[in-house]
Structures are given as C-alpha cells and as structure tokens.
Amino acid sequence: MIPNHILILGSPNSGKLRIANLISRNEEIPQLEDAESHSGLIIKTSLRTKYYFLKLNILIDEYLESKETPDESKLSELHKWYQEFKSEEFGELREVLDGLMFTINMKTDSISFIGEALEIIEQIKLSLGDEESFHNWGGFIAVVGSCPVNQVVEDDVVLEIEDMVLSHGLEFINLSTEGENEYKEKQGKDRIVELVESHDWTNLEMVKVDSKQYEANKLAKIESMKHKLINEKEELDLDDIFKKLNLARDHASSLTQNEKDKYANKIIDEIIDFL
C-alpha cells in the first residue's frame, strides 16, 4: 500500500514527538536524547479505524538546532526552511503531503515571533499541492501550542495566541488540554487524533462492514435520538447547538471551498452525535 504523509514542523522542544506519539499511539517512536536533533526524522506507522486502514509516514523537521535562539534568528531560519521547501527539489514532497502541523512553545516563543511565523506558515500553505490544485490543496493544517512538562501558560496568553492563529484562517490546538470543550468539540490531544482520523486520506483501504451490524447500529442511533426528542427529562440543549453552528460559520468563512465542504460534513456529523 502507498503510504500517506504528514509533516510536523517546529523548533526544538515544541512538542513534535508528543504529537507523533499521539498519532502513532506510541508505536515505532525511536528513543531520542534531548540533545539530538529531530530534523529529517521519519516515523513509519499505520492507522486503523472502524472505517479504514492506511499506512502513514510522519515526517518531522526542525528549522534551527538550538533551543536558546533570539526571535530574529528563529524567523530567519524558518524563512530559510520555507525557501528550501518551496524549491523544485521538494516539489514531490509538497504534492504528496496530506497534512502539516506547525508547533510552537507557548512558554518560550514570544507573541511577536508567533505572529511573524504565522505569516510564513500562510506562505507554506500556498505552496502545497500540485499545479492543478494550486490554492485548493485538500490537506489539513494546524498550529499546535505546547508547554514544557510541569509548567503552566497563563490563560490570557493562550487566548491571544489562539486569536492570532484563527485570524490567519488556521486551526489552533492547545496540546496541554484534552477531552471536549463546552460546545462538545474535541480539544487538545483528542482533537489531534480526531483531525487525523477524520481526514479524507489519499491512500487507504476501506474496512468491510457487516450489513446486519450496520443496520443494527443505525436503528440504535435512531431510537436514541427519538428518546431524547420525546423525553422531557432529557431536554436537548438547543443553545449549545446554535452556538456551535455560529462558531462553525465564522470559522468556515476563512476556508477554501474544498475545505468548507469537508468542514461542513464534519460539523453535521458532530451535531448528529450530539443529538
């Protein structure tokens, strides 16, 4: 089977291996010393859900070698990385990528640096795909904010970073969280897994579904929805649904048409699950 590819890009100590661990479920991850560079690391793994099976290569790269680097130097190195990435030499890699995760250290990266880095990430996004799909790349991009173990980032800093990322039309994921938020949306570690598993992958094998089991599951879902609709003790929280729709509409306004279609299907599925 032809493998799919995602790229995790970031500076040292920004959560790249933690993300790879989540995606691969801690399989095939080499034991690395803190001092070792992660540039060029390739983790070969696989994903299996109840719907599909696929092979996945997780590519990890760094744009500088030192953890203690001034913002100007970090931006310069990130820009150099982008210039190399968009060259003809890396054309084949750009064509096969299904996803990109850019990692930041919310404790050590300044707000100024993050803002400038997001401008470069936007340029990287525009370079992805082949000539026929120019500006309409079907992959996913997420900016993942991490924090060193046993350290805490203030809530107002996290919110400021999230607002900056969203203003660039990108998704922000806080690696320090997990579970669901107040709108029943996956967040943090669970959102990373959901983002990967719900993607429309280029190369996969569909899992054969037993027709009788499928019908049984569908009937059970219908009965559950019917029960909630008629049982006064389990009222539906319509306010939560409307809030979710409004947030989804705001987020979709910055997406391409292809991204809007995929995002709309995802939201519909989430609302059905919520019901």
Curated annotation (Swiss-Prot):
Pfam families: Adaptin_binding (PF10199). Transmembrane segments: none annotated. The keyword Transferase does not apply. Keywords: Chromosomal rearrangement. One of its GO terms (molecular function) is protein-macromolecule adaptor activity. The keyword Cytoplasm does not apply. One of its GO terms (biological process) is vesicle-mediated transport. InterPro entries: Irc6. Involved in gross chromosomal rearrangements (GCRs) and telomere healing. Belongs to the IRC6 family. This is Increased recombination centers protein 6. It comes from Candida dubliniensis (strain CD36 / ATCC MYA-646 / CBS 7987 / NCPF 3949 / NRRL Y-17841).
